[in-house]
Amino acid sequence: MKEEKWIHEGLITESLPNGMFRVRLDNEDLVLGYVSGKIRRSFIRILPGDRVKIEVSRYDSTRGRIIYRLRNKDSKD
């Protein structure tokens, strides 16, 4: 049986080494997030200020996997 994960949206506040980021969730929690393999393979750039979807485990709510970068309304990419 696969573990159930919670999916939240948040804002990248800080970029850390090795594809790790500090993410402030919409509920004001601070989570350490790492980039998923699919995003890493697709060479998707994630920068501070980007909004992302992050998958958080029920058992450790301080870490999560960044699974999607949301498009900014004002950007042209």
From Swiss-Prot:
Which cellular component appears as one GO term in the record? chloroplast
**Localization (cell):** Plastid, Chloroplast
Molecular function via GO: ribosome binding; rRNA binding; translation initiation factor activity
Q: Nucleotide-binding as a keyword? A: no
Q: Which coarse location class describes where this protein primarily resides?
A: plastid
Function comment? One of the essential components for the initiation of protein synthesis. Stabilizes the binding of IF-2 and IF-3 on the 30S subunit to which N-formylmethionyl-tRNA(fMet) subsequently binds. Helps modulate mRNA selection, yielding the 30S pre-initiation complex (PIC). Upon addition of the 50S ribosomal subunit IF-1, IF-2 and IF-3 are released leaving the mature 70S translation initiation complex.
Organism expressing this protein natively: Borago officinalis (Bourrache)
Which UniProt key words apply to this protein? Answer: Chloroplast, Initiation factor, Plastid, Protein biosynthesis, RNA-binding, rRNA-binding
| Family recorded in the similarity comment | Belongs to the IF-1 family.
What protein is this chain from?
Translation initiation factor IF-1, chloroplastic
Cited Pfam families: eIF-1a
Gene that this polypeptide is encoded by: infA
